Design a protein with these regions (language model features):
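Small-aliphatic-rich amphipathic alpha-helix that forms the alpha element of a beta-alpha
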Residues: 46-70, 83-94, 172, 176, ...
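Short, compositionally biased
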Residues: 146-166
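Glycine-rich anion-binding loops of enzyme active sites
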Residues: 23-27, 34, 67-150
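Solvent-exposed alpha-helices and their adjacent loops that cap or buttress functional pockets
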Residues: 10-12, 20-23, 64, 105-110, ...
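Glycine-/charge-enriched secondary-structure boundary and capping motifs
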Residues: 77-100, 105-113, 118-121, 179-180, ...
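N-terminal glycine-rich phosphate/pyrophosphate-binding loops that anchor nucleotide-derived ligands
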Residues: 1-55, 59
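A generic local secondary-structure boundary/capping motif
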Residues: 7-9, 17-18, 89, 100-106, ...
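Internal active-site segments that recognize and position negatively charged phosphoryl groups
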Residues: 133-142, 166-191
Length: 277
C-alpha cells in the first residue's frame, strides 16, 4: 500500500503514526488492531483486552511526544460486551481520553478489534523512527521481558500477569523526550527487531551491548527478554553528549551504516529478532 500513501503525513507508511501539520501544531494519528488468538488469549478477560487495545495505541502517540485527544473504536461483538465496556471506561479514565466514535459489528470467528487514536504534538519535528545519526547513543526507558513473564503467568493461571494484561503507555516520558531525541519508537515487537527497524529507517547501524539492557526476567532468559514484545518501553537516540531527561538506560551507540543494521556485542544477532507481522 505504500504506493498509495503519497501524502507527506503518511511518512511512507514507514512509521507508527501519520503526522499532519496544522499551523504551529501537528495532528498525530495511529491505528492498531488486536486479533483474538494472536494479540490476546481466547477467553481472556474482555476488560483487560479493552485496556490493551487503548494502551497500545496511546503508546504510539507517546513515541511522538503527542498529547492524546481521543479515540475511535471498531468493535466486534464478543461473549461479554459489558465487561469490555467496563474495561474501556477504566482505561479511558486512567489516561483522561475520550471515546469520540467508531463502529460496532457482529461476526463469526475470532474477535477482531481496531482502535484509532488521535493526538496533538506541539513541537517540531515530531519524532520518527528515522533520524538516528552516527555518534548518537541508544537509550531505553525501562526493562524488557516483563510482558513475557506476564503471559506465562496468565497461561499458567498463577503469578503476576499485569505487565502483559495491562501495558502502560509512557505518555509523560514521550512528551519530555520529544524535543531532544533524534529518533524514537515504542518497543512492541521485541527490542532487537525494533532496534533493527529504527537503524534501517535511519540508514545507520545500531551497536547494542547486551549487558547494558535492563531486563525483567532472570539472567538466564536474557535472550528471550531481548526478543519478546509487548513491553512498550520507549527506544530512542540522543546526541552523544546529551543525557536523557527522563530515567533511562544507555544500551549502545549508533555507527555509520555497515553490512548489518544491528550489532549485539559486536556481532549481528542470529535467529528471529522478534515478532514479525
Amino acid at each position: 500500500m505504500r504506493g498509495l500513501a503519497t501524502h507527506p503525513a503518511a511518512r511512507g507508511l514507514a512509521d507508527d503514526c501519520a503526522v499532519l501539520d496544522l499551523g504551529s501544531e501537528s495532528l498525530v494519528l495511529t491505528h492498531d488492531t488486536l486479533v483474538e488468538g494472536i494479540h490476546f488469549l481466547p477467553g481472556q478477560d474482555p476488560a483487560d483486552v479493552a485496556w490493551k487495545l487503548v494502551a497500545t495505541n496511546l503508546s504510539d502517540l507517546a513515541a511522538k511526544g503527542a498529547e492524546p485527544l481521543g479515540v475511535l473504536l471498531g468493535y466486534q461483538l464478543g461473549t461479554d460486551d459489558p465487561r469490555f465496556v467496563a474495561g474501556l471506561d477504566e482505561v479511558l479514565s486512567h489516561y483522561g481520553v475520550s471515546l469520540l466514535g467508531g463502529d460496532t459489528v457482529g461476526a463469526a470467528g475470532p474477535q477482531v478489534l481496531g482502535l484509532t487514536a488521535l493526538g496533538r504534538a506541539t513541537h517540531r519535528p515530531v519524532p520518527s523512527r528515522a533520524g538516528s545519526r552516527h555518534g548518537d547513543r541508544i537509550w531505553i526507558t525501562g526493562p524488557v521481558g516483563a510482558a513475557l513473564l506476564g503471559l506465562e503467568a496468565l497461561q499458567a493461571g498463577d503469578g503476576e500477569s499485569t505487565a502483559y494484561r495491562r501495558p502502560q503507555a509512557l505518555l509523560a516520558q514521550g512528551w519530555a523526550l520529544a524535543p531532544f531525541v533524534t529518533a524514537m519508537m515504542d518497543v512492541s515487537d521485541g527490542l532487537l527487531l525494533d532496534a533493527s527497524r529504527m537503524a534501517l529507517a535511519s540508514c545507520v547501524t545500531f551497536a547494542i551491548e547486551q549487558a547494558s539492557v535492563p531486563i525483567a526476567t532472570p539472567e538466564a532468559r536474557r535472550d528471550d527478554a531481548l526478543r519478546w514484545g509487548d513491553d512498550y518501553q520507549l527506544l530512542f537516540t540522543l546526541p552523544g553528549n546529551h543525557e536523557s531527561p527522563v530515567p533511562a538506560n544507555c544500551i549502545g551507540i549508533v555507527h555509520e551504516r555497515g553490512p548489518a543494521p544491528l550489532l549485539l556485542d559486536g556481532k549481528p544477532p542470529s535467529g528471529k529478532l522478534g515478532y514479525e507481522h
